Structures are given as C-alpha cells and as structure tokens.
Regions:
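Mature-chain termini and adjacent capping regions
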Residues: 1-175
C-alpha cells in the first residue's frame, strides 16, 4: 500500500500562492511539494517574490528555500539575499515568518549577516527583526557604519546592537 507523498517538478518550475491581495511566488531549478506536510522545497537558483497587489515587496534569492504552508515559515539557505524596499540583506541563512494573511511577523538573518540601507551598513553574526515592535537586534561581532547628517561617518562596534525603528534610537552593549 504505497502512497505518493512528494511531487517533484524539474526544468525551472514556478509555483504561487495568493492570500487576500498578496501573492507569493517561487521559482527554482527543482520544486518539491510534500502532499502530507504541505512543505514546498525549492532547490537550485531559487527566487521567491512577495507581491502586494502587482508591486513586488520582497525578493529573496538563495541556493535553497523551504516554505511550510501550515506555519508560514520560510527558510532560505546558501548565499541568501533579500531585497525589501530600500533595504538589502545578505546572509548564510534566513528565516521569514508571516501570519495567516501573509503579513510579515519577523525575520532572522543567521551567519555572515549584513544589512545595507542607502549609505548605512551593518554586519553581525545574527540579525532579528520584529514587525510588531519594529526593533532590529544584531548580535555577535556587530559593526554598523552610518553617514550622519553632517557627512561624518559613525562606526559602532559592539557585541549587541538594537535599533528601535519607530523611535530612531540605537542601543549598543558589550565589547
């Protein structure tokens, strides 16, 4: 009594999901869909795009991506790049969590992580951003370079840095 549990698609397949006004699509060399666990795995030259209406909001590229349709967790591994509005991120691994409507809950960048926004650049072992609190936390070997209003460059090195986006406040601790 054998049951088919995984569907595998080759030759650069494409899949998408629509929730309310948001569309999430994935392209890769190979797509695997578990019919039991409802997990989609993209392998080789993967790209995911989240649209709000017809506007691309987030573009994620990685060697491999896995999306659990039940939990709303997407895990990308291997040379991960994420483009979100005017923000570019780079890391070895990323986890993106969304709610049932497809809205961002949080994002985690793990390993050789970098965030670049305009002329500001931050590096850390790990970044964590909560959409609810609008707080970005960087931990492990953190370095931030920011260009001030007067043109001066600020370099901040610490073991932990925290940026409260809605209050525009930086906190740093540890050496």
């Amino acid at each position: 009594d054998q049951k088919l549990d995984t569907a595998t698609f080759y030759d650069k397949p494409y899949a998408y999901e629509v929730k309310k006004n948001k569309k999430r699509e994935v392209k890769a060399n190979i797509l695997k869909m578990s019919l039991i666990t409802k997990v989609v795995k993209a392998q080789g030259d993967t790209q995911s795009i989240v649209f709000d209406g017809k506007t691309p909001v987030v573009v994620i590229n990685a060697n491999e991506q896995e999306y659990d349709t039940k939990t709303g967790i997407m895990t990308a591994t291997g040379t991960v790049t994420i483009k979100y509005k005017d923000l570019d991120t780079f890391s070895d691994k990323a986890k993106v969590r969304t709610d049932k409507n497809g809205d961002l809950k949080d994002i985690e960048l793990i390993g050789n992580a970098r965030i670049k926004q305009e002329s500001n650049d931050s590096y850390a072992d790990r970044f964590y951003y909560s959409a609810a609190t609008k707080v970005l936390t960087a931990t492990g070997n953190t370095t931030s370079k920011a260009i001030m209003d007067d043109g001066a460059t600020l370099v901040l090195k610490a073991n932990r840095q925290e940026y409260a986006q809605d209050r525009n406040i930086f906190n740093a601790s540890g050496n």
